[in-house]
Structures are given as C-alpha cells and as structure tokens.
C-alpha cells in the first residue's frame, strides 16, 4: 500500500521546408503558457522528458491528479481492497488536496515562472479536467455520480492590477467550457494534445493500473478506456480559434492550432516532430536534448508500473514497426494475458474509440 503513497510523492531541415512559414512564425508568436492535454499511456512522459530539456521551459506535471484520484472531492469512484486500505491509512495526507487548492497553486506557479521570464509547460490527463456533468453526459454506463466543485478564479497568475481588471471583465466563450478550469485561464493556454492508437493505449493502461486494482469493468474504466475527453476539448479549442478573439490569440499560423501530436510519429520521428512543435510554440528547437540519464525506480512499484520504459531509457526507443496495429492481431496477443471477457471489453472499447482517434489524427502535425 505504501507504493501508492510513494507514487504520488537531419530531420529539422526537412521539416522546415515542409512548413516554410515557421521560421518567421517563431519570431512573431510567444506562447508562455503551454499545456499538454494527455491521456494515460500516450507517451506523454516521453514528450515531457524531451521538452523539459529546453532551458526556456519550467515544467509541472499533473496539477490536478491528486485531487481527482485521492482528495476529499475526488471524482474517481473505483473501489478496490488496496485503495480502501490506502484511504483508511493515509493519515489525512490528501485532506487538503481540493480542486480549488490545485487551481490556486497552478495559477501561482504560472505567475512565478513567468516572472522569471520563462515559459511554463504543464501537463495533465484531460479526463482529470473534465467536469462531472460532461463525464455523465458522455458515459453510457451507470456509475456513482460525484459533482465537480464550483471553483473561484482568484486570478493568481496575474499581477494585482491585472487581477482587478480580469475579475471585472468577462467574455463569453463561443461554446461551453467542458473543463473545471476558469474560462479566462483556459483561453490563455496554448493547447498541445498527445494522442495514440487505442489498441495500444487500453492494454497498456490495464497493465500499468493493475497495481491499483483496476480492471476493464470497474467504475473508472469508462473514464480511462475512451478518447472522448481529448476530442471534446480539441473541438472546444478548434471553435475558440475560429472566433475573432481566439484567432487573434493564436497569431500567425493559427490554422495549426490546437496542436496535436501522435505518439507513434513522435517515437519514430522525434527530431522532426519536436522541431515542428518548438517552432509552432515560438521556441528555438536547437537546445532540445534527445538523450538523458536513466532513473532507478526499482524500489517504487507504483511508479515503475507507469514509468519503467521512460525511466530505464537514455533516449527515444523507436517502435519495432511503423504500421498501425490491427485489432484482431492485437486481440490474439491480449488473449495470452487476459481472460476472454477482458479481451472482448478491450476490443469493444477500442472499436468505440477509433472514430475519435482517427478524427484527432487528421489534425496531427
């Protein structure tokens, strides 16, 4: 049970040629608030590991995860023996991890980083940011409902004078905000979505989450074995950038926003994908490093379950092949690891998620 507690503690020139506007674009756009909207098991740790090597970036992962999973307002409803034991013995460690505190802390962090003249890069799994009502409206299965708390935007990312003006000024969004983040703050973020084929995502999720007692049939499976949340937020940002205020905020090259990165493109063409991303963000890609020191997580089973590959690596580990997975072939492999019911559930959820994946893939860089 302590594991859960511990867990919480040459291409460049080709790319430039394919996107000729980018060299000028780098000089015109400065995105100081970059937010990676990820999903579990989409190689988001790889993207983050590469990008955090940039000297202009200060990074923070998962500002809302503990509130979603373990705080007093938690929206995760999975119940297992290991989690019941954890909540009975955590000593109130997460009693103060409310969504409001997470928001205030994130806004304060943004202000502190920007005051140093740096960019902030944040990352959170999109599902952890979607409101309960949006979850409920998009999940067919009946599951316990827990309401999302109403958050106050204290505008802590702004100076005091700006804060007063921001609190007085409200601008209606073109479509409803599906997240817990305040409208004002959501508009200031530069969204980067990282996606991956669901036939790779869902089995990886079940393997890694086994330590928490997760199954394909528990009450949290509808949260995590879908790509709906990323598509919902992607469509929100597409609509935002199509309206005058949003288009102005995007600046030149707004047709490339929101940014979508496919994990397998990132793995197999890391230099090309990162070069495109940096240039779209107004960052010089030259300082980026693609090698790093391995990290020993052998004493932490929970972290190892999710981070073994990236922790043991010293650079990008390319895929064995570039072809998209074939579901029937994948299912035969799953049958060696899981029972018939689980394999069928994964197949069904993969089929359901394919439309969302293919839709988002069309928007990838």
Where are the language model's segments positioned?
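PAPS-dependent sulfotransferases, especially Golgi type II membrane carbohydrate sulfotransferases
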Residues: 2-33, 284-365
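Nucleic-acid enzyme cleavage-core boundary/entry regions
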Residues: 94-110, 114-117, 124-143, 180, ...
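Soluble or luminal CAZymes and related metallo-dependent hydrolases
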Residues: 94-105, 173, 222-229, 269, ...
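PAPS-dependent sulfotransferase catalytic domain
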Residues: 125-288
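Conserved beta-strand scaffold positions in the cores of enzyme catalytic domains, especially
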Residues: 59, 119-121, 191, 258-260, ...
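PAPS-dependent sulfotransferase catalytic core
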Residues: 2-118, 124-125
């Amino acid at each position: 049970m302590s594991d859960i507690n511990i867990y919480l503690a040459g291409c460049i020139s080709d790319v430039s040629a394919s996107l000729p506007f980018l060299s000028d674009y780098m000089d015109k756009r400065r995105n100081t608030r970059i937010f990676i909207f990820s999903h579990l098991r989409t190689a988001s740790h790889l993207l983050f590991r590469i990008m955090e090597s940039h000297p202009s970036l200060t990074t923070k992962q998962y500002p809302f995860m503990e509130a979603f999973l373990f705080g007093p307002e938690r929206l995760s409803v999975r119940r297992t023996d290991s989690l019941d034991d954890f909540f009975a013995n955590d000593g109130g460690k997460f009693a103060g991890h409310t969504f409001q505190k997470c928001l205030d802390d994130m806004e304060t962090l943004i202000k502190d980083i920007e005051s140093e003249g740096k960019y902030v890069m944040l990352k959170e799994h999109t599902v952890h940011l979607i409101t309960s009502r949006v979850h409920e409206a998009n999940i067919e299965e009946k599951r316990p409902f827990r309401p999302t708390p109403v958050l106050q935007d204290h505008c802590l990312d702004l100076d005091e004078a700006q804060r007063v003006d921001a609190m007085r000024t409200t601008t209606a969004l073109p479509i409803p905000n599906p997240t817990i983040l305040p409208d004002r703050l959501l508009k200031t973020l530069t969204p980067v979505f990282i996606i991956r084929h669901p036939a790779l995502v869902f089995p990886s999720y079940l393997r890694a989450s086994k330590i928490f007692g997760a199954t394909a049939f528990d009450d949290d499976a509808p949260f995590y074995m879908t790509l709906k949340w990323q598509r919902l937020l992607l469509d929100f940002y597409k609509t935002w950038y199509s309206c005058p205020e949003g288009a102005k905020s995007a600046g030149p090259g707004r047709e490339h926003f929101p940014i979508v990165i496919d994990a397998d493109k990132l793995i197999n063409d890391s230099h090309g994908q990162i070069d495109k991303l940096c240039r779209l963000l107004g960052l010089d890609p030259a300082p980026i490093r693609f090698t790093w020191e391995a990290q020993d997580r052998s004493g932490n089973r929970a972290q190892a379950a999710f981070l073994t590959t990236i922790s043991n690596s010293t650079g990008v580990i390319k895929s064995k092949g570039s072809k998209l997975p074939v579901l029937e072939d994948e299912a035969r492999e799953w049958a060696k690891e899981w029972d018939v019911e689980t394999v069928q559930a994964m197949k069904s959820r993969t089929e359901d998620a394919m439309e969302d994946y293919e839709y988002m893939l069309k928007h990838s860089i």
